[in-house]
A protein has these predicted regions:
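Hydrophobic transmembrane alpha-helices and their helix-loop junctions in integral membrane proteins
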Residues: 1-175
Length: 175
């Protein structure tokens, strides 16, 4: 909404906003800040490091069906938002944020992965492992290439199916 108002786009759809962005005098600094704010918003939903602490605890304490739905489907909306909204609208800012995004993704993979290995509860291990796998998705987005984004989409599909079934398996094992 703010981007639509900022560039004075005639309609509220992404092609009009993108065309208005191309014709506007949006500075690189403003685009960098806007992309950063979008990255923070979507990163909180996906549980990007350092905004990751809520996710694993939430999955662990939620009923199994809620954990399956959130980890398998809803978490992917944040990645989809970065791939379909933030990066196409602000491609230069996406390239500028790329190194930091890959470092944050590496933090997701290494730090959360170590916490996942240390878990003694099966559902907790799956929860932290799910958060860790989002780091691989962010690495693919951070590469800023067709191959990186394609591999991210493939991992999103595979993760959605596998983590949902792992939560279901954890529920069966617990009972």
């Amino acid at each position: 909404v703010a981007l639509n108002i900022l560039v004075d786009a005639p309609k509220f759809d992404f092609p009009s906003i993108s065309a208005a962005l191309d014709q506007s005098s949006l500075t690189d600094s403003a685009a960098f800040k806007i992309y950063g704010l979008l990255l923070i918003g979507f990163g909180i939903l996906v549980a990007l490091f350092p905004f990751h602490t809520w996710a694993a605890r939430g999955y662990d304490s939620a009923p199994t069906s809620v954990s399956m739905l959130h980890a398998g489907v809803l978490k992917k909306f944040g990645l989809y938002g970065i791939i379909q909204i933030a990066s196409p609208l602000l491609p230069e800012a996406a390239l500028a944020w790329s190194p930091l995004l890959m470092w944050l993704a590496l933090g997701n993979i290494l730090l959360v992965g170590m916490v996942a290995v240390a878990q003694t509860n099966f559902k907790s291990m799956i929860s932290y492992g799910s958060v860790m796998h989002m780091g691989y998705c962010f690495l693919g987005i951070g590469v800023c290439s067709v191959l990186g984004v394609g591999s991210t989409v493939m991992l999103m599909c595979a993760h959605g199916l596998s983590v949902s079934l792992m939560f279901l398996l954890a529920n069966f094992v617990r009972k």
